[in-house]
Amino acid sequence: MNLIQTLEAEQIAKLQEQKSIPDFRAGDTLKVGVRVVEGERIRIQFYEGVCIARSNKAIGSSFTVRKISFGEGVERVFPLYSPNVDSIEVVRRGVVRRAKLYYLRGRRGKAARIAERRDVRPSK
């Protein structure tokens, strides 16, 4: 490992001690708590939707969450190790055969549903 990779690995280890990041992948429904600063107040705003993509690039890892808000599709990209991401909770796990679910952008209503994954063996 070169010097940059070593430094990034140390930073990731330090950030993982502070907050727990669950094991999730594309197709899972997530509830992401985001820190919002309003003047002097800080509050947590939750954003719930389907994870349609995950990019694992060390400290630059991110994931995309899509939800339907008032009949309009809204996508938001969250940096995984950002201090503004307060919490990540897996609401339900989905069965998909793709790593990127961009095809959901063209689907509406029941066509955009994802079946729930029922694991026979317990998750690690």
Swiss-Prot record:
Keyword Ribonucleoprotein annotated: yes
GO biological process assignments:
translation
> Which UniProt keyword terms apply here?
Ribonucleoprotein, Ribosomal protein
> Which SUPFAM superfamilies has this protein been placed in?
Translation proteins SH3-like domain
The identity of this protein, by name, is: Large ribosomal subunit protein bL19
Q: Of which family is this protein a member? A: Belongs to the bacterial ribosomal protein bL19 family.
Query: Per the record's keyword annotation, is Ribonucleoprotein included, yes or no?
Result: yes
Where are the bilayer-spanning segments? none
Q: Which InterPro entries match?
A: Ribosomal_bL19, Ribosomal_bL19_CS, Ribosomal_bL19_sf, Translation_prot_SH3-like_sf
What NCBIfam families would the database entry show? rplS_bact
**Summary of the function given for this chain in its UniProt record:** This protein is located at the 30S-50S ribosomal subunit interface and may play a role in the structure and function of the aminoacyl-tRNA binding site.
Which GO molecular function annotation, any one, does this entry have? structural constituent of ribosome
Gene Ontology, cellular component aspect: cytosolic large ribosomal subunit
The protein's matches in HAMAP family, at most eight in alphabetical order, are given as:
Ribosomal_bL19
